[in-house]
Amino acid sequence: EWVPLPGSLEAIALLNQAGYQIAIATNQSGLSRGYFTIDDLHAMHSKMERLLQPLGGKIDSIFFCPHTDAHACDCRKPAPGLMKEIALRYKKTNSNQPLLGVPIVGDSLRDLEAGIALGASPHLVLTGKGQKTMAKGNLPDGTQIHADLMAFTSTLLKTQA
């Protein structure tokens, strides 16, 4: 069952209220492995949306890869396929780096690599797998590190003010 990290829903709502659109790109190999069904995944997404609504937040789009590493797909992060789909959805198709300057926030190197392939600005959060990711090193140049999604949001909104 999906449980939100403390402060994450509030951070998303603050981003929405500041005019940001939120897109999620997620690897969901559990679908291919039979750990859960597409209906289960949609139920998790619906729960997220339901919990965000009273806070004034929303997820604008969710893109997921159902494949395992064994599949030779372009959508499983760190491949940039999901990010390309996001760029197309938001009509950012005018260059080889359609997400130039757009923040990519994640807790894994895979997340960051998928975004920087299209020019996104990498932001590592230390929740989830973030601590292990930071300890391994090899973060992309320019990666900013934040305690959690709320810390990222606070930093972003301060720099935009």
Residue ranges and their predicted role:
Residues 30-33, 113-115:
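A generic short-segment signal for beta-strand/edge and adjacent turn/coil regions
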Residues 25-27, 104-105:
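Acidic beta-strand-to-loop metal/phosphate-binding motif
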Residues 38-60, 69-104, 108-161:
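Asp-based, Mg2+/Mn2+-dependent phosphohydrolase catalytic module
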Residues 1-25, 31-46, 74-84:
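Short, acidic loop-to-helix structural element flanking the phosphoryl-transfer center
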